[in-house]
């Protein structure tokens, strides 16, 4: 299996998995044009589309792709049924695509119906988890997003986190504002800054490394707890997560 990233809009990534036979899976195609160009250039045969949630920058290209390739099966949560989904999937179910089983994980928070797809080592997490951050809460609560992030953080160490946006640099600037002396965060920030200066992608990331540099995955970390306690005493990791998300919203 080969993993490919296709840039779209200002900072989106559309992920494509293809096998040796050229069959491919497309994840969150917000725009059809760059996907069609990649399909043509690589002689891919699209078999399926995965949708994580209903926002237009993730579903906008579905109609055109299905018109061009009517054999495509479009998997997605209930909230995407009017966006072109032909196979609604929910938490605990599996999608069998390209000879692989993808587990469906409910991750409410960014939207109420948001889902992720996992087949070792690939995690397609839409707008739930970003490198160095997490998605904004447009529909869900901090408690829901905390539980969603916790689920993803429990996946195997070697999981490849395939996020849908290039937000890494801004996320790491926020992380530095919270933990300015953290060595892992500083090292990763420098690496990301160099990559972005060359207009290079920072994704995918390995989950084991992400747990070290993503403050939203470190709500039980003593260094972070000490920083938060300087401002307010919060007893539960869930409360600390909400504090971080509120800070990030205003950053």
UniProtKB/Swiss-Prot annotation:
UniProt entry tagged with the keyword Transmembrane: no
Stored InterPro entries: Clx_II_MBL (IPR035680), Glyoxalase_II_hydrolase (IPR050110), HAGH_C (IPR032282), Hydroxyacylglutathione_Hdrlase (IPR017782), Metallo-B-lactamas (IPR001279), RibonucZ/Hydroxyglut_hydro (IPR036866)
Keyword Hydrolase: yes
Keyword list, A-Z: Hydrolase, Metal-binding, Zinc
EC top class, as a word: hydrolase
GO molecular function: hydroxyacylglutathione hydrolase activity; metal ion binding
SUPFAM superfamilies: Metallo-hydrolase/oxidoreductase
Cofactor binding note from Swiss-Prot or TrEMBL: Binds 2 Zn(2+) ions per subunit.
Gene3D superfamilies given in the database record: Ribonuclease Z/Hydroxyacylglutathione hydrolase-like (3.60.15.10)
Cofactor(s) named in the record: Zn(2+)
E.C. number(s) listed in UniProt: 3.1.2.6
GO biological process, one term: methylglyoxal catabolic process to D-lactate via S-lactoyl-glutathione
Signal peptide: none
Pathway: Secondary metabolite metabolism; methylglyoxal degradation; (R)-lactate from methylglyoxal: step 2/2
Pfam assignment, any one: HAGH_C
Catalysed reactions listed for this entry: an S-(2-hydroxyacyl)glutathione + H2O = a 2-hydroxy carboxylate + glutathione + H(+)
Binding site for Zn(2+) 2: 57-58, 127, 165
Residues reported in the UniProt entry to bind Zn(2+) 1: 53, 55, 110, 127
Biological role stated in the UniProt entry: Thiolesterase that catalyzes the hydrolysis of S-D-lactoyl-glutathione to form glutathione and D-lactic acid.
Family designation: Belongs to the metallo-beta-lactamase superfamily. Glyoxalase II family.
HAMAP family with a match to the protein in the record: Glyoxalase_2 (MF_01374)
Subunit structure: Monomer.
NCBIfam families, per database record: GSH_gloB (TIGR03413), PRK10241.1 (NF007597)
The protein, known as: Hydroxyacylglutathione hydrolase
Recorded name of the encoding gene: gloB
